[in-house]
Amino acid sequence: MFAFLEKEGISNLNDIDHNVVRLFLTDLYHQQLSRRSVSRKISSLRSFFRFLERENQVNKNPFMQITLPKSDKPIPEFIYMEELEKLFKVNDLSDPIGQRNQAILEILYATGMRVSECQGLLLENIDFSLNILNVQGKGRKERYIPFGHFAEEALRVYINDGRTKLLKKAHSLTNTVFLNARGNPLTARGIRLILNKMVEKAALTIHVNPHKLRHTFATHMLNEGADIRSVQELLGHENLSSTQIYTHVTKDRLKSVYMKSHPRATTDDH
């Protein structure tokens, strides 16, 4: 700010008015700063001038009426189905650890649940008669999330076989669904490490974590026609704006919609 004022020949802070601030904003954008960086600078200057005003060093705060630019919201990264299919094939389903890892992967992708929700999942939270999970979300808010055939099969195999074997190694019983090699409840960090090992086994070059699987769940649901309000409820978002970041569509989906919908996209004999 002070370098800008010197360039403009302004030495008295009381000479900074709305027009000067606008020029300063233009200068920031010419520097190709992100909206978030600009917002941060304006917010800091607003606080600084508020202090000066309180100390009677300036007559007014020229930044009070400036609306902060909305932050850039990056499009969430998601995993393509071909990459997911490779992950689904890496686990040894005859081994308790492999059964557990498969169940974690299937349930994270099937439900879009947060890693904390997966970590805290209890046996009594699973209703196999309806294939629905009762999840404790943020602020201990409950929500129900359905899951499909592949997740059901992976959970049943793990709970009936792998989990029973892991639990025998524990010093005390627990109703937590996902256990580590010693039979104790898995941590969120443990779940992330499990996914990292799966990626290594699958020889993928992408980064996979629970939140990326959550992004993938939302993206795939919306791309396949799920309405945004339903996805909002499944994800446990309070505000629709949190879900709207997933309304980007893949290039494949865009091309598919175009080819099906545009009258001159294809010839009749294709």
Enumerate the language-model features and the residues they cover.
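Conserved catalytic core of the tyrosine transesterase superfamily
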Residues: M1-H270
